[in-house]
């Protein structure tokens, strides 16, 4: 069994693939038994042919292929499931990362008895670095900060390519991975955090390439990464972060309620019907946002059971809101404060019901 399996996701990398594999194979000089798995993601250039020749030339190299383009995350997942090494890492084919540094990650893995080691671009080694895009770096650091807030890890570089895993750990996690593109990084980080394994970081050098040189990630991937952080981490996030996120969900639903009500009135709808329809729309938005970015959909109930539980809690909290508002008004509280207190109670009650009843999780 090889000591180290390196997954090389490849899409249109004909210019750098040979150099990448040759540099990866140099790891053997450090006494490391090696397996290199190139996963060609249906490249449009000659990458697949080059990879096939490399697999014929070197016994350490294996080639896996996708019949259609699925994305970097899908290519990595394919390789992770096929790896045979004691430790499994990821190596981009674009030469931004130096494969020889995997010896540092392996040393941390062994010395600290770690389960996962991240190679951080922001724990600075003592050498010069190439300076490129401020906003790209800022986006990476911001996404790492938000990821840490929801996973309760203390990483400096969640988006790094260099992640080293014990094979038994990653092959337990890999079948659950869903992200096919650059959402892989926040998803795998969330699931590593949920697994409760020992995570370490060590400094690595990084030689970024420009967009003119073939860099593929863009701002849309950053937005999707933010969604992935919430979608895969929020349901087990620290309670204050869940409450904060639910505040924004509630705010969005409230805006839909108000906007829908005023729009329906302006369209000539009866006041009572406008109130009811706007409330239903707001409840639907609340539910959809809850399952998209905060709680697990169908974690305990079936879809029907979950919707019925949600409807029941909406009715209960609607009655609480009505009764509390009427009661406070009867005690002489002004309408503004009566509704404000009822809204606060409703926010707390709705959150508790969502978390403990509607979207409860099996333990």
Enumerate the language-model features and the residues they cover.
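Hydrophobic helical membrane-anchoring modules
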Residues: 1-3, 152, 176-255, 265-266, ...
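A conserved hydrophobic helix/loop-capping motif in glycosyltransferases and polysaccharide synthases
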Residues: 4-13, 20, 27, 39
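Acidic helix N-cap motif at the loop->helix transition within catalytic regions
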Residues: 15-19, 45-54
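Short, acidic, metal-binding catalytic loop of nucleotide-sugar glycosyltransferases
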Residues: 23-33
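Conserved donor nucleotide-binding strand/loop of the catalytic core
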Residues: 34-37, 48-82
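A conserved acidic beta->alpha catalytic loop
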Residues: 40-49, 95
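Acceptor/aglycone-binding surface of glycosyltransferases and processive sugar-polymer synthases
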Residues: 66-82, 87, 99-182, 209-220, ...
């Amino acid at each position: 069994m090889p000591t180290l399996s390196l997954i090389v996701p490849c899409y249109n990398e004909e210019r750098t693939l040979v150099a990448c594999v040759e540099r990866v194979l140099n790891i053997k000089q450090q006494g490391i038994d090696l397996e290199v798995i190139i996963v060609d993601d249906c490249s449009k250039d000659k990458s697949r042919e080059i990879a096939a020749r490399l697999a014929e030339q070197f016994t350490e190299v294996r080639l896996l292929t996708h019949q259609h383009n699925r994305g970097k995350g899908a290519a990595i997942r394919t390789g992770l499931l096929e790896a045979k090494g004691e430790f499994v890492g990821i190596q981009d084919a674009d030469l931004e990362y130096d494969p020889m540094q995997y010896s540092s990650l392996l040393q941390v893995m062994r010395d600290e008895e770690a389960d996962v080691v991240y190679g951080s671009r922001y724990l600075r080694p003592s050498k010069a670095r190439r300076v490129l895009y401020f906003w790209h770096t800022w986006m990476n650091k911001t996404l790492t900060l938000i990821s840490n807030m929801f996973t309760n890890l203390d990483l400096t570089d969640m988006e790094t390519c260099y992640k080293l895993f014990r094979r038994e750990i990653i092959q337990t996690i890999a079948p659950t991975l869903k992200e096919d593109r650059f959402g892989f990084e926040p998803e795998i980080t969330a699931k590593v955090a949920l697994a409760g394994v020992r995570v370490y970081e060590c400094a690595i050098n990084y030689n970024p390439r420009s967009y003119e040189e073939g860099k593929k990630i863009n701002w849309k991937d950053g937005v999707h990464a933010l969604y992935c952080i919430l979608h895969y981490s929020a349901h087990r996030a620290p309670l204050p972060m869940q409450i904060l996120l639910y505040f924004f969900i509630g705010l969005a639903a409230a805006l839909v309620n108000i906007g829908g009500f005023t729009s329906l009135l302006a369209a000539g709808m009866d006041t009572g019907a406008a109130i009811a329809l706007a409330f239903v729309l707001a409840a639907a938005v609340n539910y959809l946002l809850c399952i998209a970015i905060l709680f697990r959909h169908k974690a305990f109930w079936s879809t029907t059971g979950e919707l019925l539980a949600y409807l029941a809690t909406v009715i209960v909290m609607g009655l609480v809101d009505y009764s509390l508002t009427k009661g406070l008004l009867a005690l002489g509280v002004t309408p503004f404060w009566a509704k404000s207190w009822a809204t606060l109670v409703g926010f707390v009650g709705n959150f508790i019901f969502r978390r403990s009843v509607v979207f409860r999780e099996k333990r």
